[in-house]
Amino acid sequence: MASGAGGSWGRSPPQSAVPTPWVTFLQPLSWAVPPAPPQPGRVKEDLLELMMLQNAQMHQLLLSRLVAGALQPRPASPCPQVYLEVPQEEPEEEEEEMDVREKGPLVFHHHYLPYLMPSPGALLPWPAPFFPTPACQPYLQDVPRIQHCPASREREVRAVPPPPPPSATGTVGADVPPASDYYDAESLL
């Protein structure tokens, strides 16, 4: 910041004088000590020190905001007041509203989907009476039910095959016949 050619702040410099531009030279300083290479055990200590510094700064910031908030005066009411401008209604609209009010209050019905309830015995930590639901009311009302219809007479009804022979279960011995002797080929059809 030059004060001009004459050394006075109030006057403008004469037109013949050319202002000298500022020049910045960046030169490495040879006498500066290079930083020591980080030692293996020192990195953790430096990181811990940095974290403690950040923690102290955050603590200081929070406390300063808390003090600033406590010192500032607060409004009389805890919440801001909101004023709405309501347009003036015409008498015809007021009569319509009165007719609606005379008919009765509005009723809103809320419909909730049923949900499965877990067994209350496993969730309750204290002894509580367990009241099972009545047999006439299922837990879920709109759950699809399985209906068993009698088989049509067109299909031939087969009997359920017998259980596997002992030889199929690995219990073959001298007194147990093999599976081929146990089953009769005609009984399976």
Curated annotation (Swiss-Prot):
Region Disordered, residue ranges: 152-189
InterPro entries found in the cross-reference section: DUF4587, PRR29-like
Source domain of life: Eukaryota
Full protein name: Proline-rich protein 29
Lineage: Eukaryota, Metazoa, Chordata, Craniata, Vertebrata
Gene: PRR29
